[in-house]
């Protein structure tokens, strides 16, 4: 039901309402698995700057005391941001660090974004399928969000409920999405956990924090071989 009172009916709904999850969470109360204990970064500050010289053909990810900075060259500007953990840096500290490490003049004011890394307990619940930020959030260290959206779209095309929603299809969709998202989660955690950096409380925390059994298994296999 819309704010106007108009009622929209349908057999299948795709929830693309971002962090709010208007259908998957606020309507269906699907639940959210919080992964902050695995990926402690919970904030970002972003700013656009002028380009300085020809754009390089890659994105830079630069480690800092309590997080990391992105620098993305675009056609007419550069995207910059700092991902950080609010337990170790305040918004002002992160913003100051970012502004002190820019290559060009800022074009926009810094904008702070808060997030909770994690995933919906079900991506497909009843006749609602969550995609994008409505399905969960993975910090942008490897820009995996677009990949996960593409995978969800392809999977829905392969399993589209032409004859109506059936629970076995729903369960299989959720199982496949969970497997894929868990792999991406472990991939991102690995960047933090296996680093040799120990010079700040943040990096010492990352090296000693608990990790999923699935990732520990892979690390053990790698070390044994």
Question: Where in the sequence are the language-model features?
Answer:
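Conserved FAD/dinucleotide-binding core of flavoprotein oxidoreductases
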Residues: 64-116, 134-150, 159-166
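Short catalytic/ligand-binding loop motif for oxyanion handling, primarily in non-cytosolic enzymes
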Residues: 21-24, 138-139, 181
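A short acidic-Thr-Gly-centered motif at the start of a beta-strand
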Residues: 2-7, 119-125
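Residue-level marker for buried hydrophobic side chains located in beta-strands
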Residues: 128-130
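Solvent-exposed, non-transmembrane amphipathic alpha-helical segments
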Residues: 33, 91, 100, 148-154, ...
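Beta-rich nucleic-acid/ligand-interaction surfaces
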Residues: 117-118, 173
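Long, low-complexity C-terminal extensions of enzymes
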Residues: 158-225
């Amino acid at each position: 039901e819309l704010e106007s009172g108009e009622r929209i009916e349908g057999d299948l709904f795709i929830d693309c309402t971002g962090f709010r999850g208007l259908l998957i969470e606020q309507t269906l109360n699907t639940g959210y698995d919080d992964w902050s204990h695995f990926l402690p970064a919970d904030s970002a500050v972003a700013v656009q700057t002028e380009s300085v010289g020809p754009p390089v053909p890659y994105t830079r990810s630069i480690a800092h005391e309590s997080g990391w900075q992105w620098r993305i060259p675009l056609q007419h500007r550069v995207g910059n941001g700092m991902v950080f953990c609010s337990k170790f840096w305040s918004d002002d500290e992160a913003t100051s660090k970012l502004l002190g490490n820019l290559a060009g003049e800022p074009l926009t004011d810094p904008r702070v974004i808060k997030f909770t890394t994690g995933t919906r307990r079900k991506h497909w619940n009843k006749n609602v399928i969550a995609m994008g930020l409505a399905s969960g959030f993975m910090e942008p260290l490897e820009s995996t969000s677009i990949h996960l959206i593409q995978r969800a779209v392809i999977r829905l095309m392969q399993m589209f409920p032409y004859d109506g929603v059936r629970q076995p299809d729903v369960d299989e969709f959720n199982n496949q999405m969970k497997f894929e998202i868990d792999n991406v989660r472990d991939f991102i955690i690995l960047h933090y956990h296996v680093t040799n950096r120990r010079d700040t409380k943040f990096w010492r925390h990352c090296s000693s924090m608990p990790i999923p059994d699935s990732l520990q298994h892979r690390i053990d296999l790698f070390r044994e071989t």
